[in-house]
Amino acid sequence: MDIARLKQLAGIGENPHFIQMPNPRKEFALRHHERMKLSMNESKPEKLELKKLAYETKDLAPVLSKENVEYHYNILSNGYVTRYNNKEGDPDFNYGGAMLHNLFWEQLQKADGSKPEGAIKELIEDKFGDLNSFVDEMIKTAMTIQGSGWVYLSKSGELKTTPNQSYKTDILMPIDMWEHSFTDYIPAKDAKGKYIKAMMTIVDWNQINMRMGK
C-alpha cells in the first residue's frame, strides 16, 4: 500500500476539506495517519533471506521426517521469502512467514538429549515450575488456535498464539502449528500434543539463550 492510499484511508489524502478542518480534527487525522504508518511497519527491509539450515534435512528425524523438512523449508518457507522479495501477494503475510520460519528453523538441532540450561531454564522454572509443565501449558495454549497459526514463548515468559503468519516482536521461541508442520503425526488422536512434545527434544536451547541475551 502506498503513502497516498494510506493518507486517503486516514482521511488526510487529496481531501479538499482537509485544509478547512478545525485544528483538533487535523491533529486527530495526522495522529491516525502516523499510527497506521507504524502498524504497517514501513521500516521493513527491502529484501529478506531464508537462513541456511545448520543441519541436514534428515537430522531432525524421527521428530520431523526428511520429507517434511524438505517440503516445509525448501518450498513453503522459501516461498514466503521469494514472494516478499518479488513484491507478490500480501507483504505483511509474506514478511511474517519469512521471519517466523527463520526463527523456527534456527532454533532446531539434531536430538542430543540436551535440556534447558542457563537463562531459559531459569525462565521456565520461574514461570512454569519445570520443563514438563511448560510443555503441557504450551500444548493447552496451542489448542486454542482457531485455524492456522503459531504458539510461542514470549520474551516475558508468557505463552501466546499468533494467527496465520502474523509476526510479533516479543517472540522468543515459536512453534509452527500449521497442519503441514505436524503431518508426520496425523492421524494420531493427539497429533498436535505429540508433535509439540517431540519438538521439545530438538530445540537448541543455546540458541534460545542467545536470543534472550539480545
Regions found by a protein language model. Name each.
Residues 1-44:
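Intrinsically disordered, compositionally biased, charge-dense segments
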Residues 42-214:
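Feature for soluble, non-membrane regions of globular proteins
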